[in-house]
């Protein structure tokens, strides 16, 4: 992720061009022509990782369908990395559904919005996730309920993890995913440099 004012400007221009073109293409090919959803979904995120200069190294093989991906959360960049490599639908906090532009992209990506602070909605929100899994789709969940600098995994706060206990008979697959930002500009990342990309 090399930085310079000129490179930042170029990336901004590419971002402005890429987002409307790719999102419009995704809408047209999937919702109009009924083509494969995740092909264009992942293409959108891969374009973003390329624009931002993010190189991803993957260890292990992700499940293809009907899986609950349980992941640590460090940065908004996590979304790009996971979205470009997993056939999964994100679970996001309900506030994001009110963010201009971002909310439209999330809805296009079938994001499941949840209110983590409303205990009375937990049952309905668990059903939303289980319905997706029952259809053979996979879901990406950040059970820590917040982000960190990535030095450790925070205690799980998400009551949505109860879906595993309550739906034992469904035999859902659970795959843990760990994200680590190991290099910045090609150099190993020390703890003091993590605020460059971590949101906590």
Task: List each language-model region with its residue ranges.
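A short, well-structured juxtamembrane/interface segment
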Residues: 43-67
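Soluble extracytoplasmic domains of inner/organellar membrane proteins
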Residues: 122, 129-130, 137-141, 145-156
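Generic beta-sheet signal
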Residues: 65-71, 88, 137-141, 172
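A cross-family acyltransferase "interaction/gating" segment
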Residues: 103, 151-200
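Short amphipathic alpha-helix with an adjacent loop that forms part of the alpha/beta core around
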Residues: 60-63, 128-133
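Catalytic core of membrane glycerolipid acyltransferases/transacylases, capturing the structured
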Residues: 19-34, 38, 49-51, 67-120
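Alpha-helical bilayer-embedded segments of polytopic membrane proteins, i.e.
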Residues: 7-22
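Short, Lys/Arg-rich, polar N-terminal cytosolic tail immediately upstream
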Residues: 1-3
